[in-house]
Amino acid sequence: MRQATIQRNTLETKIELSVNLDGTGKADLNTGVPFLEHMLDQIARHGLIDLTIKADGDTHIDDHHTVEDIGISLGMALKEAVGDKKGIKRYGHSYVPLDEALSRVVIDLSGRPGLVFKADFTRASIGGFDTELVAEFFQGFTNHAQATLHIDCLRGKNAHHQAETIFKAFGRALRMALEADERMADQLPSTKGAL
């Protein structure tokens, strides 16, 4: 089983995160950031990843450190759980609509961190959650998963729908990239021989 548990403690946050990449989409989330929990549940459900997160952060200041550090921890756990990347598809992509909103996410588990994020949210916050933190979450993830990630919210009028399509599409793209490629067997999906 491709699993990992990360404990990450700083002066700002204490996070314990477990991931099972071959799960069924179960999520047990206690982050202190309700909207983020709703989005993380989308990653688990649509990525068929079991995700357990307990986070204690300085949310009395704001949600920034907690959101960013959960992204970092998820990236670290994914990198550890995926291992040497032999036999995986490596690339994944997904378009996801939700009513008027549509997002596209493309991922490459390349070993090269990079985020291209384009989302013009129609509101600055969703129920107290700053929409700028969506990019912060994914920046933390890409840096520590060592993945290249392109996220485009192509349209939308409702900021909640915009964010939700991004997280759902991310889960589905990640699921595709992590799938076993029987034709690759124990080979790395790269002509370089290393990822």
Curated annotation (Swiss-Prot):
Pathway(s) per entry: Amino-acid biosynthesis; L-histidine biosynthesis; L-histidine from 5-phospho-alpha-D-ribose 1-diphosphate: step 6/9
One of the record's GO molecular function terms: imidazoleglycerol-phosphate dehydratase activity
InterPro entries for the chain: IGPD_sf, ImidazoleglycerolP_deHydtase, ImidazoleglycerP_deHydtase_CS, Ribosomal_Su5_D2-typ_SF
EC number: 4.2.1.19
Gene3D superfamilies listed in its UniProt record: Imidazole glycerol phosphate dehydratase, domain 1
Catalysed reactions listed for this entry: D-erythro-1-(imidazol-4-yl)glycerol 3-phosphate = 3-(imidazol-4-yl)-2-oxopropyl phosphate + H2O
GO cellular component, one term: cytoplasm
Protein name per Swiss-Prot or TrEMBL: Imidazoleglycerol-phosphate dehydratase
